[in-house]
Amino acid sequence: MPTKERHIAMMGYRSVGKSSLCIQFVEGQFVDSYDPTIENTFTKIERVKSQDYIVKLIDTAGQDEYSIFPVQYSMDYHGYVLVYSITSQKSFEVVKIIYEKLLDVMGKKYVPVVLVGNKIDLHQERTVSTEEGKKLAESWRAAFLETSAKQNESVGDIFHQLLILIENENGNPQEKSGCLVS
Ligand SMILES: Nc1nc2c(ncn2[C@@H]2O[C@H](COP(=O)(O)OP(=O)(O)OP(=O)(O)O)[C@@H](O)[C@H]2O)c(=O)[nH]1
């Protein structure tokens, strides 16, 4: 099968771990320092269910509830990773606002999305429950994962699940449609 190219945008509030998830996925390492992103791109070859993909990731600058949705991320993207930190209720609220804006800008009712609750290694500081995350993802018909970029927990699954959702949207169902919850 010929290799397919898929463009994925990482979005969410500041400091939730978007860059760390990209770096962990692409380079297999965790950098314990904080350098706010303006915009960064990463490329990785991934194989899912015998299909090779060139995954182009765009790591966006953190957004907040007042940000205007950056229109450039609504065009030529196949899917989105919306990230919050399980230690920040604010980041959970912001991800809901980003999702609404995304649908609005794209003029669509459905967009392939994986909702990610990151930083699960900081479980003692958790303020967003797994149940809240799951419910939100179900309401979006999105996949849901809790991850740790630091401990490399479920990071690869984000991109595998998103590639499957994108494939399903393109009329090539490889898995049962509907909500993918792990
Ligand atoms: N404990 C823990 N810290 C994390 C994790 N992921 C990221 N961090 C830390 O959180 C801080 C912010 O991480 P970034 O990856 O820069 O976050 P970002 O969402 O890209 O931030 P912006 O560029 O401002 O949007 C850094 O100090 C990271 O080391 C994680 O899974 N666990």
Swiss-Prot record:
EC number: 3.6.5.-
Sequence similarity: Belongs to the small GTPase superfamily. Rheb family.
PROSITE patterns associated with the record: RAS (PS51421)
Subcellular location: Endomembrane system; Golgi apparatus membrane; Cytoplasm, Cytosol; Endoplasmic reticulum membrane
GO biological process, one term: positive regulation of neuroblast proliferation
Propeptide, residue positions: 180-182
Gene: Rheb
Protein name: GTP-binding protein Rheb homolog
Binding sites annotated in the UniProt record for GTP: S15, G17, K18, S19, S20, V31, Y34, T37, N118, D121, A149
Organism: Drosophila melanogaster
Phylogenetic placement of the source organism: Eukaryota, Metazoa, Ecdysozoa, Arthropoda, Hexapoda
Function noted in UniProt: Binds GTP and exhibits intrinsic GTPase activity. Activates the protein kinase activity of TORC1, and thereby plays a role in the regulation of apoptosis. Stimulates the phosphorylation of S6K through activation of TORC1 signaling. May also have a role in activating TORC2 signaling.
